[in-house]
Amino acid sequence: MKNSSGKIPEGKSNVSGMKLALSNGATWTSTADSFVNNLTLANGGTVNLAGDAHKVNVLNEMTSNDGVVATNSLDSKVEIANNAKKEVKKLTVKGTGAMADAIAKDSSVAKKLANVVTDASGKSAATNVTTDEGEVAGAYSGTVDANGNLSGSLAKNTTNENISGLGVISLMTWRQENNDLNKRLGELRDSKGQYGLWTRMSRGEAKYNDLGIKNQYNYYQLGYDARISDDWILGGAVSYTDGESSFRDGDGTNKHTGFAVYGSRLADDGSFIDIIAKYAHMKNEYDTYAGAGDGDYSTNGFAFSAEYGKRFKGQNDFWIEPQAELTYGRVDSANFTTAKGVHVHQDSLDSLVGRLGFALGKDVKAGHVYVRASYLYDFKGDVNMYMDKDGAADSYDHDLGGGWWEFGVGTNLNLGHDTHFYFDVERTASGEVSTPWQWNAGIRYSF
């Protein structure tokens, strides 16, 4: 009997002189004790040992050239009889994801999987051993030598590696909310009132290409400040971020609710200092069809930044403004359990970003236009996540540290004596995380 596509009926086979040939992905699903006289597997031809533990005996001859024996039980067997010929060039025994998790906590399970197919001497007749991905562990891949010795390893679980990107998203979005004085408040030099009320919105996209993560976000901020001296302005703001992320094997949402206090000094010589402290409560939720399963958690973020710059006036209303900024941010650790019962711990995340840049602008009748460029470097940026369930455990590490460039163009427009509008677009180049686009728009009213 030959079969190059489709299935042989499930169940017990007691046919005298039975010759079974499976090729090109054809599958025989066996659910009870069976035998064949001759078994030939080629090009993905598969014997699927389904159901409860049982045995398939090969009585005369087994030939395999890229054949597969798949099993959902370590107690199911394919046994090549004493007098049978064995011509195995390549034979893969494939186990389930649950077996991968079992191997993660006890490596000897891999040998048991290899021994699902044995020859007359009791040695494994397989040349390769693989599994699907588990809930915690990645897929196992091993090879069996001529003496029946097995060597192999577990890969990282690709779905869980993407889930570990939640920490990446947390740091990405928190770092993305860092902003200099001009992004937040526009051109304060044109604001002459004692008090200021302002609001702004940013929308953008951030990518972490190592995991195929994309996060699109909307950031809203509402603030109020007061002039406490000729040079200093003191204020506060509330903010809300709403983000939607996608990654291989899943998607998610991230929401931040926070507040900030700030102080800004604008001196007569063109120099300025801007200091801001921020807090946010962060909620993350994701859905995925594999790996550790769906999950959600919340944590807190803190940040403190200080910026210094000075504007130098040139001819024909042109000016240049060198800037330097240092921002420290932290996202607290988090613990949660997924829908599949996997325990997850995310370490606290630290970011220390230094920025050196400049803005080159021109005063126009309605306000100012400018271009800007900065180089930023995160001296920290490590993201670490740990997962475990029933003794199987793994960890995932990502490094968002290093440098990148930021480029932007924008304008500040005086809509009236008391009202100012500001708009800015930017993108980044290089770095572990990229921002293909972001725009920022705000309006400030002084009184």
Which residues does each predicted region cover?
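Extracellular beta-strand/loop-rich repeat segments of large surface/secreted proteins
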Residues: M1-N115
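Short, intrinsically disordered, low-complexity segments enriched in Ser/Thr and Pro
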Residues: N60-E61, S108-S124, Y219-Y240
